[in-house]
Amino acid sequence: MAMKFIAPMAFVAMQLIIMAAAEDQSAQIMLDSDIEQYLRSNRSLRKVEHSRHDAINIFNVEKYGAVGDGKHDCTEAFSTAWQAACKKPSAMLLVPGNKKFVVNNLFFNGPCQPHFTFKVDGIIAAYQNPASWKNNRIWLQFAKLTGFTLMGKGVIDGQGKQWWAGQCKWVNGREICNDRDRPTAIKFDFSTGLIIQGLKLMNSPEFHLVFGNCEGVKIIGISITAPRDSPNTDGIDIFASKNFHLQKNTIGTGDDCVAIGTGSSNIVIEDLICGPGHGISIGSLGRENSRAEVSYVHVNGAKFIDTQNGLRIKTWQGGSGMASHIIYENVEMINSENPILINQFYCTSASACQNQRSAVQIQDVTYKNIRGTSATAAAIQLKCSDSMPCKDIKLSDISLKLTSGKIASCLNDNANGYFSGHVIPACKNLSPSAKRKESKSHKHPKTVMVKNMGAYDKGNRTRILLGSRPPNCTNKCHGCSPCKAKLVIVHRIMPQEYYPQRWMCSRHGKIYHP
């Protein structure tokens, strides 16, 4: 178990040093640059500003032939402008305000020169008629970018209305949607150090904003909207990615506000407004007997308004793997169906899915300070597998009642764990709060460190980086296969644990993979 550390403000300015084992006090372990950059990520929130000296690196799409009248095809002009801007350091590709530019499918490919900004102040719109699209996979695709910013006060409109028509039908009381033929609006692949800020995304034919194989991403102050009945129009989808920070976003669509898929870890969501939609979903995981892994997800501050679900974890029968180290706290529900839902029997087939023995393990999930009203009788539903019960489920300070004011209920099937404080509705088979058994490997950390690796103070938000290593992990900088060390990012109140992929030893300048 990681050593707890509460730092007074005076210590925030201290430099954090990860000390090596007692046998070698001179060796130091440093985070590799990408993780360090993530920990310092708030410093990247400043607005992109350009001096007069930088003005030569502004690339206005109009100068490359784009016509912002909402009629002309500007696809080639956007592509040409991108290629020119991509080659220049500190470039800004500008879509000017008060104009509407129609484009077809575009592939914005990297790598590009550092500090590249795509600033959208006007409207970028897709073709309304699906027959006019070049393909039905992705509208605006970004790939292989590092240190890239997509920002502005403009709109990116997927014009999805004609795509949605006839895509869904009801079979045996269940809505079945054909989602194979509609494109995603925006997708990022194989990119690091991204900032998405300030934009309004709307009416995507299918998913609005998707990230695959990305790392170190901040999404700040964007809005995503689509009609309540628009099929599969997820707001933000994340898969096979890590180190994400979503802050102060507003999402209301016909599906998940945020969906976190397999291979994702270290996802922080703060101050989200969600609704309409299907809430925040982890999953679905384990489809077609696949293995799935999701870990270290922290939702701190969210409001769900008239959503079909609130905080949902969904897995298919027959899968394997694990969803773990998940924290939901400081959440408000307003007339939301299924405010708290774990469903290990997720199924979209028109007929009932076959019962299977294996399942994705769900463990170490915390719900803290969840309040509001439920539109369904069972405000808490823990529907866990009998062959793979949910472990270490923790409920603390829960107050959920029906929208009508009546008492709600809790459904608990095969979920084991604890409760503390007032939990309404009460859940059977959960024990009163008890001390968790300490892991032997982390019972007595060898060292604790604190250095200038992400420790800083900004307003009311303080972050301290802590580290600990198991007692049998010595001389880390001298081994070829060092054991894992645990880092804890103290994020407001609730710590978020994080296992780095690489360590760099400053003594030798080598990178080791734990």
UniProtKB/Swiss-Prot annotation:
One GO BP: fruit ripening
Subcellular location: Secreted; Plastid, Amyloplast; Secreted, Cell wall
Gene Ontology cellular component list: amyloplast; extracellular region
Signal peptide: 1-22
Native source organism of the sequence: Cryptomeria japonica
Family of this protein: Belongs to the glycosyl hydrolase 28 family.
Known catalytic reactions: (1,4-alpha-D-galacturonosyl)n+m + H2O = (1,4-alpha-D-galacturonosyl)n + (1,4-alpha-D-galacturonosyl)m
Sites carrying sugar chains: N460, N472
Main location: secreted
PbH1 repeats mapped onto the chain: 214-240, 241-262, 264-284, 294-315, 323-344
Protein name, entry field: Polygalacturonase
A single GO molecular function term of this UniProt record: polygalacturonase activity
Enzyme Commission number: 3.2.1.15
UniProt keyword list: Allergen, Amyloplast, Cell wall, Cell wall biogenesis/degradation, Fruit ripening, Glycoprotein, Glycosidase, Hydrolase, Plastid, Repeat, Secreted, Signal, Zymogen
Enzyme kind, highest EC tier: hydrolase
Matches recorded under PROSITE patterns: POLYGALACTURONASE (PS00502)
Propeptide intervals in chain numbering: 23-45, 434-514
Active site (catalytic residues): D255, H278
PANTHER family xrefs: PTHR31375
InterPro entries registered for this protein in UniProt: Glyco_hydro_28, PbH1, Pectin_lyas_fold, Pectin_lyase_fold/virulence
